[in-house]
Amino acid sequence: MISVLRLGHRSQRDARISTHCGLVARALGASEIIYSGEPDPKLVESVKAVVKNWGGPFKVSYEKSWRKVIAKYKRKGFSICHLSMYGLPIQTIIKKVRKRRNVLVVIGAEKVPGEVYKLADYNIAVTNQPHSEVAALAVLLHEYFGGKE
């Protein structure tokens, strides 16, 4: 099971990009996305509408505390994979990640707190260049599922 945690959503600034994170997560094989940061019922309803119209068991929810989400998933035995341009190259780590049955993928919006890097089992870089968290999520899911998403 792949779950995605979107950190630090800002309703005015991130509505579109956070929606795209949910759409990519759903389309490329994740089971759910959890948003943290500012509450944004429109965002959650928008992704739920896509699930209703296009089908599938995908879940979307909001949790104020990202720390609680990470702690909960660690207790459930999930591996925590944080996507960051400062991580290990995806090419060198993806085989290990694929062996993990349950993975929580963490993607940022605003500046990611240093604590996330420490809590993660893997800090993974899709490239060492700045780019979109949507792109990083898409590449990770594609690589995790070996193109069979």
Predicted features, each with a name:
Residues 116-149:
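Structured adenosyl-cofactor binding patch, chiefly the S-adenosyl-L-methionine
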Residues 43-44, 66-70, 90-91, 113-114, ...:
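Short, well-ordered alpha-helical microsegments
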Residues 1-85, 145:
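RNA substrate-binding interface of SAM-dependent RNA methyltransferases
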Residues 25, 106, 140:
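Conserved RecA-like P-loop NTPase ATPase core
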Residues 18-20, 48-50, 94-98, 119-122, ...:
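Short, glycine/charged-enriched secondary-structure capping and boundary segments
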Residues 33-39, 64-66, 111-117, 135-139:
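Short C-terminal domain-edge/linker segments immediately following a structured domain
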Residues 87-126:
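Long, charge-patterned amphipathic alpha-helical coiled-coil/hairpin "stalk" segments used as oligomerization
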Residues 80-84, 107-108, 127-128, 148:
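Glycine-rich anion-binding loop/nest that anchors nucleotide
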